[in-house]
Amino acid sequence: FFGGGNIAQALISGLLLNGMSNKNIFFVDRNPLNQKKLNNLRVKSLKKSNSDIDIVILSVKPKDAIQAYKEILNNYKNPKIVSLVAGIKSSTYIKLDNKSEFMRAMPNTASKYGQGITALYNSSFKKSNFKKVSSIFSKLGTVIEVDNDSKIDTFTGVIGSGPAYFFQTLKSFEKKLMRLCNQDEKIVREIIANLMKGVGSSIEKDGDLDNLIKACLLYTSPSPRDKRL
């Protein structure tokens, strides 16, 4: 991992949780706080270039991406690079170097728990190497291959920010539940977690959102008899 911020930490945690050895994961990051968090996961910092590194995952902020990409090119011979950086198209990187294998990936932070969603776009990876990367991300949840570079940017909003939309909605539930449950945070957290688990299970078993909405409304709406009572 070239960059050890939040998304890198989430992916590394998920990989370790799902059986990958920490001996197979390395990181490069100058931030002392990130170094400390990753060291706590028993992942080693790579102090210098290593020809044994199979895949380099570019996981820095967009403003640092091109400089970091150049550093990778200078330190690794014909590297296989997977970019997690939002908003920078494959062509921008390939113009700098067209010999290295390159692809983009857009995971979300739920990868930390093995419940993530990752979109992949293959720019120039060999088929066998692309399968290897897809296999790695499949340890973290669902993998979707897209056929267009621009779709990765769309997935940034849908997948990357998707959990935030739900969390924002849940904040209003939390506020009401706190009043109903006499400010008991533990109970409220349990209710919200079970609510989301139930929603997930319902979608897995049925899948038709209209039917699920109707079922909920039928269950919660009073019948004519109830109204008379």
Positions of predicted regions on the chain:
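Rossmann-like NAD(P)(H) cofactor-binding subdomain of soluble oxidoreductases
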Residues: 11, 26, 33, 50-120
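Short pre-catalytic strand/loop immediately N-terminal to key active-site residues, enriched for Gly-Thr
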Residues: 152-157, 212-213
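Short acidic-hydrophobic, aromatic-tinged amphipathic segments that line or gate anion-handling sites
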Residues: 44-48, 145
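Internal alpha-helical scaffold of NAD(P)-dependent oxidoreductase catalytic cores
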Residues: 92-101, 117-154, 165-205
